[in-house]
Swiss-Prot record:
It is found in: Cytoplasm. PANTHER family: DNA POLYMERASE III SUBUNIT ALPHA. The gene is dnaE. One of its GO terms (cellular component) is cytoplasm. It holds the Pfam family DNA_pol3_finger. Belongs to the DNA polymerase type-C family. DnaE subfamily. This is DNA polymerase III subunit alpha. GO terms for molecular function: 3'-5' exonuclease activity; DNA-directed DNA polymerase activity.
Amino acid sequence: MGSKLKFAHLHQHTQFSLLDGAAKLQDLLKWVKETTPEDPALAMTDHGNLFGAVEFYKKATAMGVKPIIGYEAYVAAESRFDRKRGKGLDGGYFHLTLLAKDFTGYQNLVRLASRAYLEGFYEKPRIDREILREHAQGLIALSGCLGAEIPQFILQDRLDLAEARLNEDLSIFGDRFFIEIQNHGLPEQKKVNQVLKEFARKYGLGMVATNDGHYVRKEDARAHEVLLAIQSKTTLDDPERWRFPCDEFYVKTPEEMRAMLPEAEWGDEPFDNTVEIARMCDVDLPIGDKMVYRIPRFPLPEGRTEAQYLRELTFLGLLRRYPDRITEAFYREVLRLLGTMPPHGDERALAEALARVEEKAWEELRKRLPPLEGVREWTAEAILHRALYELSVIERMGFPGYFLIVQDYINWARGHGVSVGPGRGSAAGSLVAYAVGITNIDPLRFGLLFERFLNPERVSMPDIDTDFSDRERDRVIQYVRERYGEDKVAQIGTFGSLASKAALKDVARVYGIPHKKAEELAKLIPVQFGKPKPLQEAIQVVPELRAEMEKDERIRQVIEVAMRLEGLNRHASVHAAGVVIAAEPLTDLVPLMRDQEGRPVTQYDMGAVEALGLLKMDFLGLRTLTFLDEARRIVKESKGVELDYDRLPLDDPKTFELLSRGETKGVFQLESGGMTATVRGLKPRRLEDIIALVSLYRPGPMEHIPTYIRRHHGQEPVSYAEFPHAEKYLRPILDETYGIPVYQEQIMQIASQVAGYSLGEADLLRRAMGKKRVEEMQKHRERFVRGAKERGVPEEEANRLFDMLEAFANYGFNKSHAAAYSLLSYQTAYVKAHYPVEFMAALLSVERHDSDKVAEYIRDARALGIPVLPPDVNRSGFDFKVVGEEILFGLSAVKNVGEMAARAILEERERGGPFKSLGDFLKRLPEQVVNKRALESLVKAGALDAFGDRARLLASLEPLLRWAAETRERGRSGLVGLFAEVEEPPLVEASPLDEITMLRYEKEALGIYVSGHPVLRYPGLREVASCTIEELSEFVRELPGKPKVLLSGMVEEVVRKPTRSGGMMARFTLSDETGALEVVVFGRAYEGVSPKLKEDIPLLVLAEVEKGEELRVLAQAVWTLEEVLEAPKALEVEVDHALLDEKGVARLKSLLDEHPGSLPVYLRVLGPFGEALFALREVRVGEEALGLLEAEGYRAYLVPDREVFLQGNGGGPKEEVVPF
């Protein structure tokens, strides 16, 4: 439907006019190209921002549409600094359409959009005419839509003010100012357009036809209307909601535009001018082939270049990293070989002298140094050669400044008490990075490759991401701001979009669909890799969704509208890690806004910032580093030992013993159930085992873990029989991982050793394999086979080896990253092995806001024999605290108390000594500081137990709060000296809390049960259970198939949801004093189980256990405590295994035979390594046997008969022998 009429849309909103523009860039540009195929052009003019400018520019250019970067500004009625509503439209701001004519115009748009946010934000980001005049060069201005100032004055019949404003705009823009004419069929436009036409004639101004597009096609109007209702939080039933007056705000064809502004009335001028303006606008953004890296200048010591200073720091660093090999004497000898007299002075003088040596001299020396390919031993000469090679690549690619900047902020952080990770990603493969302190793991010891990080065959900006303690990360960003200038550093923006589930729920709300129904619909959308599938795909694969659309017309509309809105941007926010550092003020190139704390943030996202060649860094907050800080502090406080993580021995037997036992709870990367079992099976002996394990423990390579473990234990030989001619090359590379390719670096080394690739070329091969580029892969195969044949590997074997590498490339892991992160795993395990109490206290402190984690770690502490005590206002600290060999809850972990109140309690205790009573506590801490809700939580948590029984304390809060307030008031008014002080009233009498209530209160206040677990307070439940939750995996391990077990516990967190087949399912957490697990129930079992699923009640659960990497527990039936206690009884007899010799068995049998009856009998045998339960199938006794057995010294008791429950109300097979 292409048109030959010339026209360009110059006023178009996109998805970056958040919750207002419904035009997705791809759809928009495709439609523009379709409707104006000859010289298509389009202006992007989003409301008050430039969020999408770079993405729009790139996509438009790629699709053959000329991009015009614009901006619909909000102009303040008076000053941008005004913070009061004026009389103008929308509270004192008006619209104005601005287009960038050239790169200067683009820069001025950036500055205006930035200052609107940084200086003029009040409800909207506003500019004013002062800065408009300041930044008008290179801009074309259109007079605007109905919301602009001139049209508003016309509508108010204030033509003198309209003309005055027109003259002011002319004084700013001159012949770059045009009259904007729009016609959406609105009566207001008809009135305005006639006056605008007269102004154009009077002042000789060009007129321009625009359409204020907010969506792409006319049929998108309904979806746009819904989008506006999402923005305004209204529904379609609300007559007062904000909406557009008609459905004409779409991207019209040239013919439709001319129909709205007939030629007889308007002529060709408004249309021809759009084409003329499109021709005039020619912004050439420095992206793609024109992009240059914009690395800021690092502040250098006098007389140094960036390359020299990086060399100097590297040579200094090598002395400190390898003192046994790189010595001052070695450096003096190197200088002599270079023909330079070594200077007098310290190591810095030597490093400076080496740094000043010309590159040509180094090149000559490198020819005499041992080659780097296949280095077996890292001698001083080899280390120097590797460093020189890396430096030459870094210099040739132009990145010394990059390394200097990164090492500067990392070393500043370390020097100012901010914990920094040992490395992240491929940067750990660089010796230079290690020498200058960027990374903290030795790349030579672990065989890490520089080319995996910085490839001399492929010029691209290095990417060094850094982990900092998540509590201290912001300090480092602030340092960078101060170092390079507040105007040159900002965090990077990002955009949250309407994913399928969110879009569906938002649209459903607007249509008035009940919240519960909307949630049900959203839950039907499958989630893959953590992301919900698009609605279009979901409809195809989920028949329930299709059925809902067919049976309910409103739901069909909701889903269809949601599909149109899906993928639109919903909000702007701050990227979790990205920081940009610029050489010049950022607003020369990138628009800025502010986050909620007032800090500058780029309006562009990460991709746009990188596309412009700006230096982007990732400053990540890693909680493990915060944990290690906390552990070091607690160990120092508790044991007087100063932990230095950089000096820990990496072969500590105690650490590897802990890992081999599977005690990995809280150990970085190793604490999941499946990983724990794998670590226990592997029994690692060296750090390299951990590196391999975290690399293999991912979908795909996991299948090789059993082989790795067997070979690790010598149960299976390492064989290279499949590649007999290549074995001599493969063995040195793969022996470390028992012949199994694990790392990407191994691909590179094999290509290098077997086929003669340089490591840089080998990295290109790795990338090609990962991206499956067919043509490129064929070229590489030919090259690989040719090189292998030259090294004695036959063609057929070389092809097989290439096939193996190609298959492996899909799951090979980055060894540099694995090594750096495995070092953190080792460090956390070391702390747990040597300081378990301090380890658990630190872990609990950093996870105090996650009650599930706290509960899990408290159970682990108790399993290690470490008591965790409730909080105490006279003993607790802010966080969890070590007292002897026990852990005391921190006050900040008590719900409703908050950090400020916790600190106030500690400060008052420090100032006035321990609290003597509840009254003393209340008198010293006013209710404004510690409110009644916080006080109730403190009592329920046990933090005030020293002052009395919890029931009495709760009952006394009201009268004692009144007494405390009156006492403080008397003190303020000076009455205390005149009259005797009113004594503290005694605690109110109240019945003590029963144990169940007390435990429930503890969970309410602390998120967990501390003094015990309610399940132990319900006699009968535990006795029937097959095992505890903690024992479950061990219990079912040797049982065949999908064993059935009985589990008892408290029900927590019940979630019910529909299944794809139209039924219902539920998930719930079952907890006992040893742990908690998730139980799933669906199918026929759901109807019987669901009514009994209520939170905080005890249940007995018959479950089928599916064994795998993680156990899956499926409920078949459940019983309440009452049902359990009412069930038929059995007799249980406890007996020590030592008494079950021939004589003991005969004695017990004769006692049981004396009183025959109907009760089944179970024998619980207590042994040195646990206990076992046996059903005596042929024996039935009467209740009288109980007394006889007790009289004879046996421990015997009546319990509910397990067989009743194992049958699941008739739903399960009867076991011949029941091993509980």
